[in-house]
Amino acid sequence: MKKPSLKYCGIHSLEDLKVTARSKADYLGFIFAESKRSVDPADVKRWCGETDTPGKKLVGVFVNENMSRMAEIVKDAGLDVIQLHGDETAADIKRLKSMTDCEIWKALPHGNDTVQSMASFAPYIDGYVIDSSVKGMRGGTGVSFSWDSVPLYIDAAQREGKRLFIAGGVNPDTIADLLKRRPPGIDLASGIEERGRKSEKLISLLEERMFEHVFISE
């Protein structure tokens, strides 16, 4: 199988950024919303100025943020992607699209109507992140959903020509099971952390197991 796009999210220190910058990830994510991994835009701008991230795109994660403020943050910090985890409507995203050149991804919870929701946002976004549905949480659940549904989401994203990332409960011990469903993208945060910090050891282990599966599948 083709190597999935890999996104490491929840970077919340300069050291986190340096560790993940040395990884094989394609995307690195910063959370600009209430979270234990929340970061200040000024810090992100400074960290990015001090760290080379060759071949990696930078993602800003937002929850119900003002559209103008989002566009301002990503431009100032030099980010490439806006990832929306709130109650944004299609009309909101259409407006945001007119304010930025960044890609826009919409995070959606796994559920019975997820494919329908994907179709409703398709005209205005560039990708989807599908995560577990956990009451009171906006992503970053650390809990997996039934990955038997992943092929449905892959089909829906391919029909619309959009990126797709699967999130929730992905770590070195579970990645082989997820890869059996051939996801085009994988998004994780806590699965590569030890004591709240990004772990070079866990990143290396996850990537080793991912590439082993990709090689065997081919």
Curated annotation (Swiss-Prot):
Q: Which UniProt keywords apply?
A: Amino-acid biosynthesis, Aromatic amino acid biosynthesis, Isomerase, Tryptophan biosynthesis
Under Gene Ontology molecular function, one entry of this record is: phosphoribosylanthranilate isomerase activity
Task: Return the similarity comment.
Answer: Belongs to the TrpF family.
**Catalysed reaction(s)?**
N-(5-phospho-beta-D-ribosyl)anthranilate = 1-(2-carboxyphenylamino)-1-deoxy-D-ribulose 5-phosphate
Extract the PANTHER family matched here.
N-(5'-PHOSPHORIBOSYL)ANTHRANILATE ISOMERASE (PTHR42894:SF1)
Which InterPro entries does this entry report, sorted A to Z?
Aldolase_TIM, PRAI_dom, RibuloseP-bd_barrel, TrpF_fam
**Hey, which pathway is this one from?**
Amino-acid biosynthesis; L-tryptophan biosynthesis; L-tryptophan from chorismate: step 3/5
Listed as disulfide-bonded, the cysteine pairs are none
Its name, as the record gives it, is N-(5'-phosphoribosyl)anthranilate isomerase
**UniProt key word Kinase:** no
- Segments spanning the bilayer are none
- Which Pfam family, an example, fits this chain? PRAI
Q: Which GO terms describe its biological process?
A: L-tryptophan biosynthetic process
Q: What is its EC number?
A: 5.3.1.24
